[in-house]
Amino acid sequence: MGRAFEYRRASKEARWDKMSKLFPKLAKAIQVAAKEGGADPDMNPKLRSAIATAKANNMPKDNIDAAIKRASGKDSADIKNIHYEGKAAHGALIIVECMSDNPTRTVANVKAIFSKNGGEILQNGSLTFMFSHKAVFHLEKYNGDLEELELDLIDAGLEELDQDDEELRIIGDYTAFGELSNAIEKKALVLKKAGLEYLANNPVSFSEEQLLDIEKLLDKLEDDDDVQAVYTNIE
């Protein structure tokens, strides 16, 4: 997904009151990370990043602690990571990441959203080769020497570092998530959010009118309780 389009989406979300949707999704990410890698953030980079992302979005500590506790509970839901691939209006490519305790419900909802908003679901594997799976860290702007920071992070798996007026973004291969997370923490950089993302290999430009059509589908997907993230090939 292109940087300009990311900020367009971010500013749009900032105008909407989405906390009622956001906090449960952040809690679900924390719960899954804790269940997969253990409840100790010091030993679990994914959990550590999920917690940092939640804090950056002003999620209360009680909510964070409750999500971690649910992961180790006897009655904790079996939440699965699922992804779907599809096309929006004007041929925009979309990968949808979900966390769900009921995949049957989730796939039905996602299919309905695509079909009702000018899109279509594709067979999994149809689009993933057009994207790269990356560890992506979104951070507050860095005021130090970027070249020096880049050199310091290369050994941890850094592939790309870029900064604009909004944030610093650090990218590495998905297998380097843990190492990069540890290296970033040692640098005392301020994390806004982090995770594994699908980045388009060849982003495509769309007109303003086309983007409005595409965003109708994106908005509906992002509003679904089971959808954690939506990635596109929009430049």
Swiss-Prot record:
This is Probable transcriptional regulatory protein Cla_1081. InterPro entries: Integrase-like_N, TACO1_YebC-like_2nd/3rd_dom, TACO1_YebC_N, Transcrip_reg_TACO1-like, Transcrip_reg_TACO1-like_dom3, YebC-like. One of its GO terms (cellular component) is cytosol. Gene3D superfamilies: 1.10.10.200, 3.30.70.980. The keyword DNA-binding applies. Belongs to the TACO1 family. It comes from Campylobacter lari (strain RM2100 / D67 / ATCC BAA-1060). SUPFAM superfamilies: YebC-like. GO terms for molecular function: DNA binding. HAMAP family: Transcrip_reg_TACO1 (MF_00693). It comes from the Bacteria. Keywords: Cytoplasm, DNA-binding, Transcription, Transcription regulation. Pfam families: TACO1_YebC_N, Transcrip_reg. The keyword Cell membrane does not apply. One of its GO terms (biological process) is regulation of DNA-templated transcription. It is found in: Cytoplasm.
